[in-house]
Structures are given as C-alpha cells and as structure tokens.
Amino acid sequence: MLSKQIPLGIYEKALPAGECWLERLQLAKTLGFDFVEMSVDETDERLSRLDWSREQRLALVNAIVETGVRVPSMCLSAHRRFPLGSEDDAVRAQGLEIMRKAIQFAQDVGIRVIQLAGYDVYYQEANNETRRRFRDGLKESVEMASRAQVTLAVEIMDYPLMNSISKALGYAHYLNNPWFQLYPDIGNLSAWDNDVQMELQAGIGHIVAVHVKDTKPGVFKNVPFGEGVVDFERCFETLKQSGYCGPYLIEMWSETAEDPAAEVAKARDWVKARMAKAGMVEAA
C-alpha cells in the first residue's frame, strides 16, 4: 500500500562519494530518507554512468529492491559543459547525445524525472542565438522523453534565463507537452527578487518535485540551513495549501565533509522541524 507520508529524499552529493549504490541506499535508509536523487554532472566519472553495462544497471535496480529506497530522479547538470544552446555544433550535438543516453538510462533503471539545468550556455556568453538553440534543443529532448515516458523537469536556476517559475512556465507553454514540467529550487527562487509565494502558487499543476536548500543573494551553494534568506515555513505552507503532494529533496554537497552522515542528519532534522511547523504533520 502506498504511504501518505510526504516523500523526503537526499541528493547523492550529500552522501559519501563512491560507486556502490547498495551502500549509498542503505545509508539513506538508515538516515530516514525515502529516496536518493542521482547526479550526472559534467565530470567524466559521473558522465560515464550513462554508458553503464546491463549488469551495472541491473545492480542499481537490485539495490533499490533490496533496500526499498528509490532512485526516482536524476539531476542532469552535465549540460553545463555540453549546453544545448551552444553555438558550436559539435558541443551541442554532444549535449543532445547526453540527453538521449540519460533518457535511455532512466527508462532502464526506473528513473521517472530528469531534472534539467535551465542554462542555454554556462561558460560562454549568452545571446539570441544561444537561446534559440536552447529552445530547439529542449523541443528535441522532449520528443525523445515522450517516447520513453520519462518526465523532463527544468530547475529554477542560479542564472537569469530561468530564475523564476514564471520564466520556466514560458518554456512549458512553448513546448506544450505533458512530459516537460518544473522542478523548482526554493533556495534559488528565494535568492532572486521574486515574490516566492506567488511564484510557487503559479507553478502548481506543473511542479513535479521541489529542491530544498538555503541561499543568500549571490550565494547558491553550501549555505547552512537557517543562515540564509529562505522562509522555509512559508514556502512549505504555500505548497501545502496549493495542493502540492509531491516529493521534497534536500540538496547538499557534503560528500567530502569529515562526517557526511552527521551533516545530513542535522539538516534532515532541521528541515523536518520546519515542515512540521508548516502543518505538514506527516513530516514530523
């Protein structure tokens, strides 16, 4: 029977680094999480996952079954290095190939949502042509995802092109496809000059998951919970009152910390306390 508990997950990069998914999922279970979000970033090491053998993919599936901890989503940030908006045709083609492989990987191991980075380009200067290429790349990507029944969900970013739900909704309306949705990060959303509550309400019906982290203006990573500008209780209240019932993912980068598990446990308790104050009693 499906649980009515609010699904709470942890980002892979919060946990100790390594390639043993059975150990990672066992640790996540011990720490009280329902799921882990996989990272496929721009490093060769994590990109190589998209070329895993059948046996390696099956090992992940078996680890999920054995532990009961799901891997329902992938954070695909590799497009920083190989952007869909690149004016270099070879780089852009590589970005589309990464997308194809990621969708196939997701289909094979049961990942339902691929979170996309909302960058047309990252290390280059953006212009009208990079934005056009990005739009066209998204259109091609969503066609692939539709055939595979895998949802692509764009993150609200630390970058002006996609720094609000309102902007992301523009792409959702442009693509007009149920396999393209939104994956807001309440930290990124709060670090810009946004009406956060209005933005969250505007996204309801398109939000498939929520990243939870703290931020400061101009500082989007590694801000300890409670030391930034995010009004967590109001964000959680707004999402609850708007009818959002989906997963929340604590995003941290503590994999190289002296004691990652202790850092994660501390963050989990802090976040769950704010959820409880917001009336999300299932999270207490």
Curated annotation (Swiss-Prot):
Keyword annotations of the record: Isomerase
Keyword Isomerase: yes
Coiled coil: none
Class in the EC hierarchy, top level: isomerase
Record Pfam families: AP_endonuc_2
UniProt catalytic activity: L-ribulose 5-phosphate = L-xylulose 5-phosphate
Gene3D superfamilies membership: Divalent-metal-dependent TIM barrel enzymes
Inducing or repressing factors: Induced by L-ascorbate. Repressed by UlaR.
UniProt key word Isomerase: yes
InterPro entries for the chain: L-Ru-5P_3-Epase, L-Ru-5P_3-Epase_Enterobacteria, Sugar_Epim/Isomerase, Xyl_isomerase-like_sf, Xyl_isomerase-like_TIM-brl
Transmembrane segments: none
Gene Ontology MF terms: intramolecular oxidoreductase activity, interconverting aldoses and ketoses; L-ribulose-5-phosphate 3-epimerase activity
Its EC number(s): 5.1.3.22
One example of a Gene Ontology biological process annotation: L-ascorbic acid catabolic process
Pathway annotation: Cofactor degradation; L-ascorbate degradation; D-xylulose 5-phosphate from L-ascorbate: step 3/4
Family of the protein in this entry: Belongs to the L-ribulose-5-phosphate 3-epimerase family.
Task performed by this protein: Catalyzes the isomerization of L-xylulose-5-phosphate to L-ribulose-5-phosphate. Is involved in the anaerobic L-ascorbate utilization.
NCBIfam families: hxl6Piso_put, PRK13209.1, PRK13210.1
Name of this chain's protein: L-ribulose-5-phosphate 3-epimerase UlaE
